[in-house]
Amino acid sequence: MTNIRKTHPLVKILNNAFIDLPTPSNISSWWNFGSLLGLCLIIQIMTGLFLAMHYTPDTSTAFSSVAHICRDVNYGWLIRYLHANGASMFFICLYMHIGRGLYYGSYAFRETWNIGVLLLLAVMATAFVGYVLPWGQMSFWGATVITNLLSAIPYIGTTLVEWIWGGFSVDKATLTRFFAFHFILPFIITALVMVHLLFLHETGSNNPTGISSNMDAIPFHPYYTIKDILGALLMILTMLTLTLFTPDLLGDPDNYIPANPMNTPEHIKPEWYFLFAYAILRSIPNKLGGVLALLFSILILFLVPMLQTAKQRSMMFRPLSQLLFWILIADLLTLTWIGSQPVEQPYIIVGQLASALYFLLILVLMPTASLIENKLLNW
């Protein structure tokens, strides 16, 4: 009798994706983050579902419903903090995953890469609307500041902002619709993940050398299933340590103050994972210019495959590109730090220089370095 996993229409799909999938024999731990992101998504949907059972999306009760979850619901505090810190783990894995893609040239798989950038945008949107839901000070003012950026769009801006708000300010209508968005987006993300995997399995995985591994592939199971389980255990350990020892380490104390439209917090800033983009937004003294820079700082990832000039796919054997890559990482860390600082000197000028360097590296320096390396190959 033929094996059911090779004949059954549904099981066959799973078999070809997770069991008999031919995988390069030399992929490193940097290839673990895809499965970790899948795990993060599952954790977020599960904890989010239980939170939604007790949360009320209404301005008068939202804040107290979150307090009620933490105080009165069985293990509600655990579910709430797993969900909050799960978002941080999600972004850590996302940024590692994107960094791996940039370093090893995974962006050469155009469709997979573009769906991945769409996924990044969807996760960022989900995190933003989710941050508004506890209805603390930073929730309210974050929503006000970020939605207000749309008013920079010529002609239709103000109308657009009022349409998104559902009124003339961030209020009950805004909170209700943001809850609806926050609930639906993870399912859209799940669908996109399936498309992401579909395109990936058309070509097979890349590997650290950037060379085709068709002649040296091994089955995904048991080799990479066990490797993914190890990665998952390490991530869960990190997440539980963070959640159980320092649950508020990455949060903002201002969000423990109920939202008050009459009182603006001293420093309005987003969660840590948006700080680099926030720093780029603030570094341009013009509203529309800042909004465009903010948008382009993420959308620039769509251009990466087109800016590819190197003859070698991976940066493994390209020291000049490696140097620029790590400068880019240092620059992003600098931007993250600047985003958390007040708008005053010397932070303003450092932020402007770091923002300029970010675009310069991706658009000019890295493609130029690749061309120089191509020349060196001919020596």
Curated annotation (Swiss-Prot):
Subunit structure: The cytochrome bc1 complex contains 11 subunits: 3 respiratory subunits (MT-CYB, CYC1 and UQCRFS1), 2 core proteins (UQCRC1 and UQCRC2) and 6 low-molecular weight proteins (UQCRH/QCR6, UQCRB/QCR7, UQCRQ/QCR8, UQCR10/QCR9, UQCR11/QCR10 and a cleavage product of UQCRFS1). This cytochrome bc1 complex then forms a dimer.
Positions of a ubiquinone binding: 201
CDD domains: cytochrome_b_C, Cytochrome_b_N
Natural source organism: Pontoporia blainvillei
Protein name, as recorded: Cytochrome b
Keywords, ordered alphabetically: Electron transport, Heme, Iron, Membrane, Metal-binding, Mitochondrion, Mitochondrion inner membrane, Respiratory chain, Transmembrane, Transmembrane helix, Transport, Ubiquinone
Gene name for this UniProt entry: MT-CYB
Any one biological process term the GO annotation gives: mitochondrial electron transport, ubiquinol to cytochrome c
GO cellular component assignments: mitochondrial inner membrane; respiratory chain complex III
Bilayer topology term: Multi-pass membrane protein
Sites where the protein binds heme b b566: 97, 196
Residues reported to bind heme b b562: 83, 182
